[in-house]
Amino acid sequence: LNVAAGCFARQSYPATSMNDIAAACGTSKARLYHYYDSKDAILFELLERYTQRLLVIIGQVQATAHRQALDERATLHALIRAFLREYESSATRHAALLASTQFLGDEQRGVILDRQRDVVSAVTRFLRRAYPERVDARNQTAITMTLFGMINWTFTWLRPDGPLSYDAFADEVIALLERGLSTPLATASPQ
């Protein structure tokens, strides 16, 4: 599945054939078909496992926070760090999630989109608990999507051997949240 994710990331899902995946795996197309009946089946299993992994991370962070009696902000910060650690090792799977879900059949796409919604809902809850004075029903979607906007596309530009590590980037994201959400929003004065 990791090899297939790499093929999808390099060539795009539509441009990748079963021959390409088999060649990248160093096996025959017939052997690949022994395990998967189609390229769609590979994509679905890849995305199904990856989205399940993201939900497991959320559960692990919640359990660790409970055991360690972390406050809500520390719990959110732990989640951001955990997601970015996962993104560092799952760049091609994450790219497939963001770019290739649309190519699944309706039922399979629905499963993956529901999982994505579950992840977004969980992050929204983490944000609301961490910054109850700033995140509410009015702005929760915008703030949640801002956070995802900061972290979801790291696979396109953040390199483990680059000048900024994933851990250091997590510190930057957390600092931006802290500076941006820990103080009351200034209201515009009437003109």
Locate predicted features:
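Helix-turn-helix
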Residues: 3-41, 45
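Short coil/turn segments at alpha/beta junctions that flank glycine-rich nucleotide-binding fingerprints
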Residues: 10-14, 90, 133
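Short, structured helix-loop boundary elements
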Residues: 18, 40, 44, 69, ...
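Hydrophobic alpha-helical connector segments
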Residues: 45, 59-89, 143-147
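Alpha-helical bundle regulatory/interaction domains
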Residues: 46, 50-53, 186
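Amphipathic alpha-helical packing segments from all-alpha helical-bundle domains
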Residues: 52-59, 106-132, 141-145, 171
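Short secondary-structure transition hinges
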Residues: 84-124, 135, 156-158
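C-terminal peripheral helix-coil segments that are non-catalytic and often amphipathic
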Residues: 85, 89, 120-129, 148-150, ...
